[in-house]
Amino acid sequence: MEIRLAKSYGFCFGVKRAIKIAEESPNSVTFGPLIHNKNEIDRLKEKYNVELVEEIDEIQENSRVVIRTHGIPKEKLALLKEKNVEVIDATCPFVTKPQEIVSKMSEEGYSIVIFGDINHPEIKGVMSYATDPIVVLSVEELEGKPLKEKVATVAQTTRKFEEYQKIVNYLMEHKKEVRVFNTICNATFENQDAARELSREADIMIIIGGKNSSNTKQLFKICKENCPDSYLVENAKELEKEWFEGKKVCGITAGASTPNWIIEEVIENIKKIQV
């Protein structure tokens, strides 16, 4: 069986930056998961004593607090800054961008439409910088929503571009003025395009990443559209021998929060599978 890697996959700029910040801040805490990859979070704890905390009340005075890549709501950031702690901001710059955009557009009187998952930490952070934002995942969710005649729209950095286009087209058809900010990350574009291309050539796709990672789930969705035998795994232990029976080309891609050491372990384990 031939194993092919996608042309673009794995750690993005924002995640690499956040991991470096955490490694250079031993004995610190992260407010929320730094990235959506449990294996890497466990490694940071074991090797650098970087602890995960979910609530501000859990943070001790004089702590060093690393802000997660997804950012946090501005109210929580303000509360942190009121405490006697050192705040180290590892928010991805590509996530900070939509925060700044919705803040400015709200001040200028635009209705704000955010394309993304309202329960995702990145979107919760972006929402906090906007006035009465409307968050949707589809045109159907947008229909009937109260909007001014001038609208500004941003997207979650890890969503599918084609789905964002549908939102934008709907707004352009129904509103007089629409300011469109394409805030989907370039790394997301590249990884998705590479996954799409490879999944058309493979008869099995393995997508490596956290099951709670938005960008990894998008990769899985894209691969599944082209290759029905697509599987999302967090690590090599989740591989099943029977998946590979009769397969000739195994394609591999990985989410933006997936470290190389996990990808290499998965590849080595696939090589050992004899079917």
Swiss-Prot record:
Class of enzymatic activity (EC top level): oxidoreductase
Its EC number(s): 1.17.7.4
Free-text cofactor note: Binds 1 [4Fe-4S] cluster per subunit.
Entry's Gene Ontology BP terms: dimethylallyl diphosphate biosynthetic process; isopentenyl diphosphate biosynthetic process, methylerythritol 4-phosphate pathway; terpenoid biosynthetic process
Residues the record marks as active site: 122 (proton donor)
Binding sites annotated in the UniProt record for [4Fe-4S] cluster: 12, 92, 185
Binding site for isopentenyl diphosphate: 36, 70, 120, 213-215, 257
UniProt cross-references to CDD domains, sorted A to Z: lytB_ispH
Cofactor: [4Fe-4S] cluster
Single GO MF annotation: metal ion binding
Annotated catalysed reactions: isopentenyl diphosphate + 2 oxidized [2Fe-2S]-[ferredoxin] + H2O = (2E)-4-hydroxy-3-methylbut-2-enyl diphosphate + 2 reduced [2Fe-2S]-[ferredoxin] + 2 H(+); dimethylallyl diphosphate + 2 oxidized [2Fe-2S]-[ferredoxin] + H2O = (2E)-4-hydroxy-3-methylbut-2-enyl diphosphate + 2 reduced [2Fe-2S]-[ferredoxin] + 2 H(+)
Keyword field contains Calcium: no
Keywords from the named record: 4Fe-4S, Iron, Iron-sulfur, Isoprene biosynthesis, Metal-binding, Oxidoreductase
Binding site for (2E)-4-hydroxy-3-methylbut-2-enyl diphosphate: 36, 70, 120, 157, 213-215, 257
Pathway noted in the entry: Isoprenoid biosynthesis; dimethylallyl diphosphate biosynthesis; dimethylallyl diphosphate from (2E)-4-hydroxy-3-methylbutenyl diphosphate: step 1/1; Isoprenoid biosynthesis; isopentenyl diphosphate biosynthesis via DXP pathway; isopentenyl diphosphate from 1-deoxy-D-xylulose 5-phosphate: step 6/6
Record flagged with keyword Nucleus: no
Function in brief: Catalyzes the conversion of 1-hydroxy-2-methyl-2-(E)-butenyl 4-diphosphate (HMBPP) into a mixture of isopentenyl diphosphate (IPP) and dimethylallyl diphosphate (DMAPP). Acts in the terminal step of the DOXP/MEP pathway for isoprenoid precursor biosynthesis.
Family statement drawn from the similarity comment of this UniProt entry: Belongs to the IspH family.
Name this protein carries in UniProt: 4-hydroxy-3-methylbut-2-enyl diphosphate reductase
Organism: Nitratiruptor sp. (strain SB155-2)
